[in-house]
Amino acid sequence: MSKRALVASLLLASLICSPVRADPIQDLQTLVKQGQFSQALERADSILASKPRDAQVRFLKGVVLSELNRSAEAIAVFQKLTEDFPELPEPYNNLAVLYAQQRQYDKARIALEMAIRTHPSYATAHENLGDIYARLASQAYDKALALDSSNVAAQNKLALIREMISVAGKPGRPVAPAPVAAAPQANKPAAPPPV
């Protein structure tokens, strides 16, 4: 074997045997799926240092911040995403869920209406909007009863709404971290991930 052939063989063998570097976004997605949110946040920040406008990484960072109960920071991330990529429905949906958790139902409603406007067939946003309307109805019936505690119709409606809310569980479904492969892309809205 010639020296040149030997060098070529060694080079080929080293390429075949060396571990393949994984995609940084795939690494981030894996960390999120595994619930390693602190590490995922570090990875997201690292990726964003070189790709600050990457919608998918920014979205995942918002999800991670939500999971870390850093709601104010998550809201800021999703809000900025809605400004930079207004055609993406998922940031609006997750923003609405965070607002709903803070009982800011009017803000949640507006965000969900924007999600639906950008992607009319986004079933999760429609479901979440229904939950918000139920919460708003509950508030309205509470107010009616505060003004007139003998209003039997309002009492009955409030009881129905409260029963519906308790059966349905917590308001709002974010785009969950499990289906991160469906995180938004900058050029078109992603199909709503199943939750």
PLM feature spans:
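Register position in tetratricopeptide repeats
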Residues: 33-34, 67-68, 101-102, 135, ...
